[in-house]
Every structure is written in C-alpha cells, then in structure tokens.
Amino acid sequence: MLGLRNIILLSPPPTQITRPSLPPVNFAAVEDNNTVGEKVCRDCGNRAKKECLFERCRTCCKSRGYNCVTHVKSTWIPSSATRSSSSPSERKKKLKIDKQSSPNVSLLPTTTSRQERGFREGLPGKIEAPAVFKRTRVTAISNNEQAEIGYQATVTISGHIFKGFLHYYGVDHNKAFPCLSQK
C-alpha cells in the first residue's frame, strides 16, 4: 500500500472547455490490479462515472461548478415518493385478516444448524401467559398522515426473549379475541 488515499489533487474549474487537458489520476489502478479501468474522481478519489467529461464524482462536479451533463439527472428517489399514495383507511383494509380462510403459516429456516432446529422444535405451539404491553405512537414517514397507536411487547418464552409490535386493526365487533383490559 503506497498510502495514496490521502492525496487530494485540486484543479481550478475549467473555462468553457469540453474535455479537461490533464490525464486522469487512477488511484484504484495503483492500489489494486483488479479494478484497472475504473474511473476515479480527480479531486477526492471516489469512483467517477465513465461518461463524466471532467472525470469527477457527482459531488465534486457539483461543488466545483462544472456544467456536467452526466450528473444532471439524479438516480436517487426519496422513499416518500416510492410509497403508494393510499390513505390510512385503504391500508387498514389491506391489513385486515380474512376470517373465512384459515391462516397458513410456515416457518422458513434462516440457518441450518442443529442448535437452531432444536431450539425451534422445543418451543411450545401456543402460550397463554401475562405479558407487558407498552403503548407507543406510530408515525408514518409521509407528511400528511396522523400518528397511530400501537403496543410494543416483550416476553420471555422458555428462557428466550421475544419482542414484537402490535398494530391497531380496528374494533373487534365479533368478540373473536379475548379482552386483556377493561379500560
């Protein structure tokens, strides 16, 4: 390792040129032969786009004031824009349990160790025990939705800690579930 990661090369912004006159400095080619051919930003050493005429990353192109057509479009999309624009009532309809069909739950193992399989097989199928539920406010990331109420629960089963979150689904008109509080 030659310690080239700490070298910063600065150059003044070009004056209406289409291609910089200096050859690119490729730190990756010096350090690792596997990455030869990648473009590296001439200012900071980060990866630069192949199409960038100024041979810089997006951040350096923007901060130096280069008029780069490669970095005009942004590929970043905010998470709020990717969410569906459904209202909270529509989301609750999607989350309601269909009482006509029996639930089909299957556990998929995340590991194949014998200890994990033995642990899962040793857990009881159903438990009726007191638990502590902590009321909490749940807010959505989008701007227009109001906070909802949920409960966080933590229980110990067979010496193992389980944590979960209970989401509000509405009033139990059919009295299908036992009432845990009279408040």
UniProtKB/Swiss-Prot annotation:
Write out the residues that bind Zn(2+) 1. Answer: 41, 44, 52, 57
InterPro entries, per the entry: SHI, SHI_C, Znf_LRP1
Q: Which UniProt keywords apply?
A: Activator, Auxin biosynthesis, Auxin signaling pathway, Developmental protein, DNA-binding, Metal-binding, Nucleus, Zinc
Q: Which family does it belong to?
A: Belongs to the SHI protein family.
Which pairs are disulfide-linked? none
Taxonomic lineage is: Eukaryota, Viridiplantae, Streptophyta, Embryophyta, Tracheophyta
Protein's UniProt name = Protein SHI RELATED SEQUENCE 6
Q: What is its main location?
A: nucleus
Q: Where is the composition biased (Polar residues)?
A: 100-113
Q: Which gene encodes it?
A: SRS6
Q: Give residue spans, biased composition: Low complexity.
A: 79-88
Which parts of the sequence form the motif Required for homo- and heterodimerization?
157-160
| Pfam families reported in the protein's UniProt record | DUF702
Q: Return the annotated region ranges for Disordered.
A: 79-121
Q: What positions does the DNA-binding region cover?
A: 41-68
Look up the record and report any one GO term of the cellular component aspect: nucleus
Its GO biological process annotations read:
auxin biosynthetic process; auxin-activated signaling pathway
According to the lineage, what is the superkingdom?
Answer: Eukaryota
